[in-house]
Amino acid sequence: TSSCASLTLIQFKVLHRIHYSKAKLKKLFNTSDKCDRCSVSPASHTHMFFSCPRLSSFWSSFYNTFTKALNKPVLQSPLTSIFGVLQESTHFTNRESNAIAFASLVARRRILLQWKDKNPPSPESWLKDLMSLLHIEKIKYSIRGCVDKFYKT
């Protein structure tokens, strides 16, 4: 969803579960498998990226932002949050799907930057990251000579 190498690497690592969750660390070492944010056990990848109660306001803000921007409901889903893939039953254009996928990748990046923090990332930090990375995406579209596509998305 992005030509930025660091974002592509993040997506690769998420897809292949390279980031060690507390549940995975528990299998390798004699450590606790409790989530650093909410102390729930086990802290699997799904928990760390989506189902942790401390992340609920973060993801609610994410989905509310897109519901308002696209003027159609974007339902919360672990598939969308963790992999950027919308459910098959949803009716979004390719451009809308790509925008949601890119934004969810930026959200995952923000979660990873605060992977071990007690406090969850703020929706404002995600929006700030998204705006700065959109600048890079605009440059990419400009170089390719299709700035119109950037603005349509």
Predicted regions mapped to residue ranges:
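Family-specific functional microsites
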Residues: 1-153
